Amino acid sequence: MKPSRRRRALLAAATILALTGVGAGPAQAEPPPDAPEQIDNGDFSTGIAPWFSYGTGPLGITDGRLCATVPGGLANPWDAGIGQDGVALTAGAEYTLAFEVSASPGTPVTAVLQLGSAPYTGYASVTVTAGGTAQRVERTFTVPDDNPSAQLIFQVGGSADEQTACLDNISLRGGEPPEPYEPDTGPRVRVNQVGYLPGGPKNATVVTEATGPLPWQLRSASGAVLASGSTDPRGVDLASGQNVQSIDFSAYRSPGAGLTLVADGETSHPFDISGTLYDRLRADSLQFFYAQRSGIAIDGELLGPQYARPAGHLGVAPNQGDTDVPCQPGVCDYRLDVRGGWYDAGDHGKYVVNGGIATYQLLNAFERTKTAATADGGTALGDSTLRVPERGNGMPDILDEARWELEFLLRMQVPAGRPLAGMAHHKIHDRNWTGLPLAPQDDPQPRELHPPSTAATLNLAATAAQCARLYAPYDAAFAARCRAAATTAYAAAKANPTRYASPTDSTGGGAYDDSNVTDEFYWAAVELWLTTGAPAYLADLSASPQHTADVFDPSGFGWQGVAALGRLDLATVPNALPAAELARVRASVTAAADEYLTELGRQAYGLPLPGDAGSYVWGGNSNIINNAVVLATAFDLTGDARYRDGAVQAADYLFGRNALNISYVTGWGEHAAQNQHSRIFAHQLDPASPNPPAGSLAGGANAALQDPFAAQLLAGCAPMFCYVDDINSYATNEVAINWNSALAWIASFLADQGEAGAVPRATCAVTYTNHGTWHGGTGFTAQVTLRNTGATVVNGWAVRFAFTGDQKVREAWLAKVTQAGATVTARNESYNARINPGGTVTFGFNATTGGGANPPPGLVTLNGTRCASS
């Protein structure tokens, strides 16, 4: 087990005792006046970040100073501290540490400059007795070692009485000025470093000063020329500022490995052409969620020994959560057990709104397999397809993983009998920010529930409604819990429609504020109607302004804008909308997809995102993927290969066809991101800590540069260059569950496309007739008629479809019918195996249902091929 932060401070203090007379004494010469500053935001003019604390009350800014309340009775100075990570030090260089400090009523404060990871070597320290009046402290010293990621800690514990400690004008001058940053962009021919599907689009981008067409060659691993042609000049690309040309080698369709493109004297990174390119990515992108689990020990035999760790936040010291968590002061008078769920991103917080969209996308990736012709009935997402502890339990593994978060979301609901009962607490996280690295089991911070919000409550309502229909075939009791929680949450949100999370509630965790929840109301109403069929929810969604609005933003949907989630489900999940209304809903999806295709064609790097700076935002890679999700959904709805090809081409950007020539997915591509901002995966800072697991998506280029590291390093960057693979850049290089959920969705779609060949024409038509209910609505009788619309005889048939919820076939006639989960398979009897062209076959069944929505299935296949509805 790694030492806790408290233990690290103790180790550093012990080491510094040996250094005090050597490098930390006052006899050192000061660095020159123009020496570079190594501390970010030392005057707190931009707020609290990147400062963190442990063992104190929340950090706050008072009269321009950074202040915290320190509890009395702490045994040691290092039991509480305020600090900053990522301080760069140069061996042999002289530094001057300066700061102003005060404490009331008064206590010793020790400033410690130390190595930020094992063995936590201390470089210098100075102890002063701080009182009510601020005093200025300076100390000059020499550093013996190079260290790009040292740590400055102000130890403020050890007093018998409660203290208020304040710091200001913190400076560490010295060392070498950073060299101008020049990213290593590799060869000027930019390709999808993973590769291309044989029948899919194959495009690359060449960065060049040439303005006329250039010859290109596709070469095998041995150097043989496989194809050739001329580039298409595109001029200066807005997003990158580069003069670029395009290569289209889509006509080459043969599989191969280790291929390269050569143009303008440059050879690309190698790539493959294969119909199985993305099969492993489907699993890798989902494995990320197991690695992010809270409240369970991570099994190294499942994920790899480097990722094994004890359970975090199960009430075992030094953890102070999550089995008995209080609210922030003044918020509530109860405590909740909110164990489990996923750690949200690079921190140890858990947030309902971000957990909501992430859970939705995993559940939707599974639900898509019921209606998408290329999904093969969801076999690739079934039981034992992931390395999770629950594998082999009879439930699809993707549902096992989503359930880990759903159980947490349910625990965040305010209990009955309490004020705001039925609403959901917005989030739970540490009282103060912590530094990096920090394993979950080593987090010493108090944990707090934050006030309930309407947005969080509606996220719970929507995802719990999804849960109620999708888990019903596997765990009826859990599905019933979800349904009850969803209906209760929706009613509570309607009773409290304007409880917004505070945008300033960002100490110790992200604010995730949202003051427009019309989209959340729409999404929740859609999910509840799809699950229950209750007219009240249909009335609410129909009356929502979002129902007829353009909900597909050019820059993509995300946690703060979720109307698109409702629209996509309304378009794809079978339901009882009138035909004209359903056609309008689906047309809105294809219209948005058309716009994304147009944008993709405009962009020289071939992505469905505008090239202006405002479109490159925090987590922007997920926005690009979410636009690809719309394209993919349009393909599922229509079978139009243009939409499939657009979604496939959008993936090229993620895997290296971009200005930086980097794959943003760890472990995928010749040159891939690996130093994402994370307290758990912090190998850059601590060699004993792993890099993020393969399949982890980096946030991506972010023109706003909201972290100090990126702001200093990348100032003036063209939008597509506003990224650095460094753990200190949380604004461009964090991991997050809602980003990986988008990746998991599109990875599953891409894997389903195989070789991306011609879309088969339907050679059958199906009529599904529900003849009505019996036994008080708990049973129904249905009939399925298939017509052979092709030109050849069908000799032996298997028909497959999936129910939306808990429907269960009890008996059938004219076919041999079996059911696994929600999926029904009907096979011919010996006497009706033959269906002549133009001929029909009919079978029927009786089934039970719990009384929710019971629409006809959205997809019926005959021998694996989609049938048209008639």
Predicted features along the sequence, with ranges:
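Extracellular and organelle-lumenal recognition/adhesion modules and their flexible linkers in secreted
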Residues: E30-P180, L862
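Low-complexity, Pro/Ser/Thr- and charge-rich linker/hinge segments at domain boundaries
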Residues: P178-R190, S268-P305
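Aromatic (Trp/Tyr) and acidic
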Residues: V194-G265, G275, A291-G356, Y360, ...
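Extracellular low-complexity, O-glycosylation-prone Ser/Thr/Pro/Gly-rich "stalks"
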Residues: A756-S870
